Every structure is written in C-alpha cells, then in structure tokens.
Swiss-Prot record:
Protein species of origin: Prochlorococcus marinus (strain MIT 9215)
Taxonomy of the source species: Bacteria, Bacillati, Cyanobacteriota, Cyanophyceae, Synechococcales
Family membership noted in the UniProt record: Belongs to the ATPase epsilon chain family.
Protein name as annotated: ATP synthase epsilon chain
Localization per Swiss-Prot or TrEMBL: Cellular thylakoid membrane
GO function terms (MF aspect): ATP binding; proton-transporting ATP synthase activity, rotational mechanism
Biological role: Produces ATP from ADP in the presence of a proton gradient across the membrane.
Pfam families in the record: ATP-synt_DE_N
Length: 134
C-alpha cells in the first residue's frame, strides 16, 4: 500500500507521485507518515521532506507552508520548494555564506528585521544543501 503525495508551490507542481513513507519537517518536529496515518493538518517549517519509494529516498527542500494528511493522501502546500537532485549545491553554499555574513553585522541580542530576514535565509540555504546532499 502506498501514500499519494503532492507537493505544490504557488507557481508550480513540485512533486506528484506515490511514496511508501514520508517524513515532513513540521513546526513541532519531524513527522513520519505511513499508510493508514490518522487525518491531520500541520504547519510545515523550513526544512527537508524525505520520501521513500522502492527502498530509495528522495529529498525535497521546503520553505514553509501546510500539509494535510487524509486517507493515504498527503498534500503539501508550500511557499516554495526544490527537489534535492535539482539543487545546485555551490549556489546554496554561497547563499549560506552570504546570509551568515549578513547576520554577523548585527549584535547577538539585536532584533532587527534585516537580521531576522538573514536568519531565515540561513535556514533556507541549509535546507537546500541538506536536500541536495541526501
């Protein structure tokens, strides 16, 4: 038995297919989904969705959103997403370096909108790197 998985961003259908297992980065921690999972709606954090099919794992970098799990169907609606195998690691590592440099310009306890934006960019770059390397 398999799970039907759809990952949708505003501008594209990122992934549509079946999976034997799905691991989502929810805002409360990693959420593992197998066939027969209880119905659920959850917020998705910036992180990596992992799916297993035929003993092979695929990774998708997610940039926050929501997921609905119901009757062996998982629908993930996100702000943006990239399939790991399509991510340019060098670009993601450069983005990470630039975001960390931007953060270093602020004091540790400073609450500045630009610092918050840079912290989010760090999370996004790290998710992209992790998805690309898995």
């Amino acid at each position: 038995m398999a799970i039907s998985l759809k990952v949708l961003a505003p501008n594209k259908n990122v992934y549509q297919g079946e999976a034997e297992e799905v691991i989502l980065p929810s805002t409360t921690g990693q959420l593992g989904i197998l066939p027969g999972h209880i119905s659920l709606v959850t917020a998705i954090d910036i992180g990596v969705l992992r799916l297993r099919m035929n003993s092979q794992w695929k990774s998708i970098a997610l940039m926050g959103g929501f997921a609905e799990i119901e009757s062996d169907e998982v629908i993930v609606l996100v702000n943006n997403a990239e399939i790991g195998s399509e991510i340019n690691v060098q670009n993601a590592e450069q983005d990470l370096k630039e975001a960390k440099l931007a953060i270093s310009k602020f004091s540790e306890n400073e609450k500045n909108p630009e610092k918050i934006k840079a912290l989010k960019q760090v999370s996004k770059a790290e998710a992209r790197i992790q998805a690309a390397k898995n």
